[in-house]
């Protein structure tokens, strides 16, 4: 690792329709087997279904869902003296967004429904309303961090 200069953060290009980086991050996480056009179709279908179901701007709903799902702290297993502790760590903004996107997509994939676009749309709506599997996962993570707060000095 060079001490000369820090590496630049990789930034994703905004998507063509909404001109938003968050949407392109979501598309890149939905992506399976290199089928980016299918990932675009899934996400835009989810956005249109959220617009149809709520009557609001889907970008606002996506942002609300991301805010509600993004964790502040996570627990990380750390081995000290032969025993493993769950050490709570604060999460940076980029890592928090990545975790929120991952949790939203896994929750929508596990959801029962017809197609991925509708499942993702319903998960976004639920997350914006502060319920749903992804929000529950964030709350569980925060509870774990709170329970293991005594081990915070092991950072």
Swiss-Prot record:
It comes from the Eukaryota. SUPFAM superfamilies: Ribosomal protein S7 (SSF47973). The keyword Ribosomal protein applies. Its main location: plastid. It is found in: Plastid. One of its GO terms (biological process) is translation. Keywords: Plastid, Ribonucleoprotein, Ribosomal protein, RNA-binding, rRNA-binding. One of its GO terms (cellular component) is plastid. One of its GO terms (molecular function) is rRNA binding. The keyword Hydrolase does not apply. Part of the 30S ribosomal subunit. Belongs to the universal ribosomal protein uS7 family. One of the primary rRNA binding proteins, it binds directly to 16S rRNA where it nucleates assembly of the head domain of the 30S subunit. This is Small ribosomal subunit protein uS7c. It comes from Aneura mirabilis.
């Amino acid at each position: 690792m060079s001490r000369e200069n820090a590496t630049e953060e990789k930034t994703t290009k905004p998507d063509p329709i909404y001109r938003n980086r968050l949407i392109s991050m979501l598309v890149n996480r939905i992506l399976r087997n290199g089928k980016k056009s299918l990932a675009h179709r899934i996400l835009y279908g989810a956005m249109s279904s959220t617009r149809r179901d709520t009557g609001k701007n889907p970008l606002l709903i996506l942002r609300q869902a991301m805010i509600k799902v993004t964790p502040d702290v996570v627990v990380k297993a750390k081995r000290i003296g032969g025993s493993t502790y769950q050490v709570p760590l604060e999460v940076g903004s980029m890592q928090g967004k990545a975790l929120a996107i991952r949790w939203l997509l896994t929750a929508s994939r596990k959801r029962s429904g017809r197609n991925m676009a509708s499942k993702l749309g319903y998960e976004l709506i639920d997350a914006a309303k502060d319920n749903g599997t992804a929000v529950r996962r964030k709350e569980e993570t925060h509870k774990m961090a709170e329970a293991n707060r005594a081990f915070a000095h092991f950072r």
